């Protein structure tokens, strides 16, 4: 008998908020490619026929904001005016200014290792052992569904798909925390006007849902909701405006872990909202990979202009194999969580961010914060 249900959602790269995230991170990458020490805070707003890019930047680099924006929108798939949003004809407004010298004064140091945090704040990292990437299953499979939607749209397996899509997966859990199965699946996808509802439902079920969701978790009682409104022709920035940083739960753990509130996209690594959240994931994943806990949530916090974290705390939900006080001591000894230290530890001062801006920042092994290279040393130091 399942004790409880838990749901997470994801959105595709063509969702308006994700278009904005990807443009912000594409601008960030272009700047970091020329100037790894740049300070970037890039925000994007998209609506019918227009994109506005704003924020604060301090850099020696020059990048073509208009060309970066058009290229990003084109790669996502908005390439026809009949979609209401066309990479080649949309208006692009550039409202980028310089970063405040007051912030620079707090961050920059004569000794780079003493670089202060770019702002105050609290960040969380999380890992558990219910998937092979040590992520919660609901968000992992929600991402997989919309990623699959993008793949079969772009390779024209389902040529009537359009870029905007959303997924949601509800898992049932047993009393011991193990997965009992999938209770419900929601997949809403934008489509051409000429496809029938019957063809759409069959195509989505056979080409997207069944290849992605493990059969062992599906049953006759699993509920499927495919385009439950019956029509999703108007989508993307025509249907809704999009803004950088509005999908922070999709970007992280799907609600299974707490969130400090800071968004990621468009921010260089001096912004601990982003870099410390990545480092916290790295710490939590290595603790779980080392077998020191089955679930681990770590919180770190910072004061603007101060290098050392103001706090580190760990919650293992009763699954720790050693005392949580020892875990905190291990974290302090094995991980440098100062802004400069974590940037060096994870090699963050380089153009790797646009790829993070759709389908989740965590649980994807191509990113350096997903490595488990500290697990063996942690386990040995813990005496296990």
Curated annotation (Swiss-Prot):
Binding site for L-methionine: 56, 99, 240, 271
First-level EC class: transferase
This enzyme's EC code(s): 2.5.1.6
UniProt GO BP: one-carbon metabolic process; S-adenosylmethionine biosynthetic process
Cofactor(s) listed in the protein's UniProt record: Mg(2+); K(+)
Residues given in the record as ATP binding sites: 15, 164-166, 231-232, 240, 246-247, 263, 267
UniProt cross-references to CDD domains, sorted A to Z: S-AdoMet_synt (cd18079)
Cofactor: binding comment: Binds 2 divalent ions per subunit.
Residue sites binding K(+) per the record: 43
GO-annotated cellular components: cytoplasm
Gene3D superfamilies per record: 3.30.300.10
Subcellular location: Cytoplasm
Residues where Mg(2+) binds: 17
Pathway this chain belongs to: Amino-acid biosynthesis; S-adenosyl-L-methionine biosynthesis; S-adenosyl-L-methionine from L-methionine: step 1/1
Keyword tags: ATP-binding, Cytoplasm, Magnesium, Metal-binding, Nucleotide-binding, One-carbon metabolism, Potassium, Transferase
GO MF annotation list: ATP binding; magnesium ion binding; methionine adenosyltransferase activity
Region (Flexible loop): 99-109
Record's catalysed reaction(s): L-methionine + ATP + H2O = S-adenosyl-L-methionine + phosphate + diphosphate
Family classification: Belongs to the AdoMet synthase family.
Subunit structure: Homotetramer; dimer of dimers.
The protein's role, per its UniProt record: Catalyzes the formation of S-adenosylmethionine (AdoMet) from methionine and ATP. The overall synthetic reaction is composed of two sequential steps, AdoMet formation and the subsequent tripolyphosphate hydrolysis which occurs prior to release of AdoMet from the enzyme.
Name under which the protein is recorded: S-adenosylmethionine synthase
High-level lineage: Bacteria, Pseudomonadati, Pseudomonadota, Gammaproteobacteria, Alteromonadales
Gene field: metK
């Amino acid at each position: 008998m399942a004790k409880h249900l838990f749901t997470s959602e994801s959105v595709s790269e063509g969702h308006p908020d994700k278009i904005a995230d990807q443009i912000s991170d594409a601008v960030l990458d272009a700047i970091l490619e020329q100037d790894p020490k740049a300070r970037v805070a890039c925000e994007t707003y998209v609506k019918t026929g227009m994109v506005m890019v704003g924020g604060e930047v301090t850099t020696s680099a020059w990048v073509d904001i208009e060309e970066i924006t058009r290229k990003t929108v084109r790669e996502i798939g908005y390439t026809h005016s009949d979609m209401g949003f066309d990479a080649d004809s949309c208006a692009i407004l550039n409202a980028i200014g310089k970063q405040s010298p007051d912030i620079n004064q707090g961050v920059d140091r004569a000794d780079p290792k003493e670089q202060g945090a770019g702002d105050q704040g609290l960040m969380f990292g999380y890992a558990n052992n219910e998937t092979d990437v040590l992520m919660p299953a609901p968000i992992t499979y929600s991402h997989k569904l919309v990623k699959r939607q993008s793949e079969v749209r772009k390779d024209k397996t389902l040529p009537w798909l359009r870029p905007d899509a959303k997924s949601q997966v509800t898992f049932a859990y047993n009393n011991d925390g193990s997965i009992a199965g999938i209770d419900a699946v929601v997949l809403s996808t934008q489509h051409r006007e000429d496809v029938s509802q019957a063809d759409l439902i069959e195509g989505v079920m056979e080409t997207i849902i069944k290849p992605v969701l493990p059969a062992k978790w599906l049953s006759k009682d699993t509920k499927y909701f495919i385009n439950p409104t019956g029509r999703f022709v108007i989508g993307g920035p025509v249907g809704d405006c999009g803004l950088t940083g509005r999908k922070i739960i999709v970007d992280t753990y799907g609600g299974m872990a707490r969130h400090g509130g800071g968004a990621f996209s468009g921010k260089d690594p001096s912004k601990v909202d982003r870099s410390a959240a990545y480092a916290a994931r790295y710490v939590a994943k290595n603790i779980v990979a080392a077998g020191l806990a089955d679930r681990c949530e770590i919180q770190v916090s910072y004061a603007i202009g101060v290098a050392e974290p103001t706090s580190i705390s760990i919650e293992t939900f009763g699954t720790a194999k050693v005392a949580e006080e020892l875990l905190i001591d291990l974290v302090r000894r094995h991980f440098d969580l100062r802004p400069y230290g974590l940037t060096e530890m994870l090699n963050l001062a380089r153009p790797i961010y646009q790829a993070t801006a759709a389908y989740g920042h965590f649980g994807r092994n191509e990113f350096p914060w997903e490595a488990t290279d500290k697990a063996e040393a942690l386990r040995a130091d813990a005496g296990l």
